[in-house]
Swiss-Prot record:
The species this protein was found in: Escherichia coli O157:H7
Protein's name according to its UniProt entry: ATP phosphoribosyltransferase
Cofactor(s), names only, from the UniProt record: Mg(2+)
Keyword vocabulary terms for this entry: Amino-acid biosynthesis, ATP-binding, Cytoplasm, Glycosyltransferase, Histidine biosynthesis, Magnesium, Metal-binding, Nucleotide-binding, Transferase
Record family assignment: Belongs to the ATP phosphoribosyltransferase family. Long subfamily.
Oligomeric form and interacting partners: Equilibrium between an active dimeric form, an inactive hexameric form and higher aggregates. Interconversion between the various forms is largely reversible and is influenced by the natural substrates and inhibitors of the enzyme.
Keyword Transmembrane: no
Amino acid sequence: MTDNTRLRIAMQKSGRLSDDSRELLARCGIKINLHTQRLIAMAENMPIDILRVRDDDIPGLVMDGVVDLGIIGENVLEEELLNRRAQGEDPRYFTLRRLDFGGCRLSLATPVDDAWDGPLSLNGKRIATSYPHLLKRYLDQKGISFKSCLLNGSVEVAPRAGLADAICDLVSTGATLEANGLREVEVIYRSKACLIQRDGEMEESKQQLIDKLLTRIQGVIQARESKYIMMHAPTQRLDEVIALLPGAERPTILPLAGDQQRVAMHMVSSETLFWETMEKLKALGASSILVLPIEKMME
């Protein structure tokens, strides 16, 4: 990590964002061995070093200029931002873009048998959480006083253990809450993974590499959100068929040998193609409908 000409990226070593971060880098063409226990891995084909750390260390590494980029959940980033501001610091960084994974929500949850009449039900209560600053900001805005119980794991067991009256924790499906006799009552923050960059002057070669990486990330995300569609469509109903499949550009229309009533149509659709859409296409006279995934895409 002493070579300042190499781009330094921090990502979660293990946990909720680890696998998706690793897949994103791989699909961007960065060849790197992340299957070892090493905390620092060097890309084989680009001047990039990957620093594998705990997720709650990543915002600080970027804000302090130790690394150039970080892949982090917005919930962890915002919590660290509020923490540093509470200590009188002025943390600086840039959010380059939101990513298409790591979606979750930070929610309040109470025992299923407790009455719930809105956030005021928590006035004067003890709330267990790993996100004290996000919780405080939300309840301060509501004018609600509470006692915070800071836990760094297993937050959902706090009410049963008598440590708290309610919890504020990340929720994906709600299954963990249900298993612990809790119900989600209020969402206070919605989060996805994001790519952030340190503040300050960046070497030109590094900035060019960051720009290239951003272009590739955009292509990866567009490819995941798009499908390549091929079909035979009736010429008299082409406009109706196209209207069902919004895309970035107009479709490619090709003649069919020996068939004057239909054409072959190829297009990239920017929306998920549901079974209902395919059934509507078939009702319009389309046939031989193929929906294919896209590995890479660049407009």
